[in-house]
Structure formats: C-alpha cells, structure tokens
Amino acid sequence: GIGYHETSNLDEVWVIGMRNPYRISLSNNNLWIADVGSNIQDEINFVSTDSNNLDLGFPYIEGNLSHGPFTDDLKFPNKNYKKAILAERIGGLIGGHPINFGGYKMYTYGVMNGDLFGIKLLDNGIVKTKIIYDDKTFESENALLSIERSRNGIYLLTLNGTVVKIDNSW
C-alpha cells in the first residue's frame, strides 16, 4: 500500500492512502480492496476503476477513525470492522462465480470466528451487508481461515482443514 499523501498526475495511480491491501478483487470495472488496519480497524474499500488519484486516508484515517488532519479528497471506506481476538476479517472476492442473492453480485468476506458476510451495491449506490452463511462448525476453535473461488464455486477453509463449498444454489 501507499501510505504517503502526495498528489499524482499519473492515470495508472488509482488509489493512495492504504496501509496493507492484501486481497484485491476486480468486478465490472470496479475494485474491492481488503486493507488491514494498523491496530484498530480493518477496511473493505470499493473503488471505481474510472477514478484515479483517490486518497483513502492512511495514515490519517483508519476505518472511520481520524488520526490526523482531514483533507477534502479523503474517502471513508465502505465497510470496516474493529479488530478483536479471532475476529479479524478474512477478505474476500467477487465476480466470476459470485454468490448471488436477489440478482446482486456480492463481495464475500468472513471473520475468523466463522461468520460469513456479503456486501452488495444497489443501483442507487447504497452498500448493504447481509449474513449469507452461518454454520456452527466455524466456532472459534475451528476458525475460518480463507475464502477462495474456483470455476466450480466458492470454498471456505477452516483451521482444522475442513473445506466447505458455498454457492448460490441454497
């Protein structure tokens, strides 16, 4: 991630001000970026690839918290989660073979306690979160470790090695 705050005139620079972007997913000319926070909040950022020079604020902003001066061009993240023991976010994916509820493609992500969520963008730009999977096999002693997509579906990997397929057929 680029944590400095300098203006760039390069068209290929879409986003600055991220701490540790570790999972990027591209869908319909948009980027979904999972970004690990420093010690308080993680972020899931939605960025249109039509924009460039977008500043997500790090190190001045972490999630929705300000650590420094605001500027007019900072953009707050779409969704963020407070860090806690066994509650870090496991980010996510969209596109290709998306989980699809009500006709919406969803960015799928989880937290290490096993809860799985989706974020969808509606036509009016509103972002909503919906729990899309809840299974008691993903309790804290069997935490969710990874979400991966293949041509056959979306899979979850747990701490004890269990692989669970999820898709839009349920």
Where are these regions (language model features)?
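Short loop/turn motifs that cap or connect beta-strands within the blades
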Residues: 132-136
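Blade-level signature of beta-propeller repeat domains, shared across WD40, Kelch, NHL, RCC1
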Residues: 146-170
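Beta-propeller domain segments
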Residues: 1-131, 142, 149
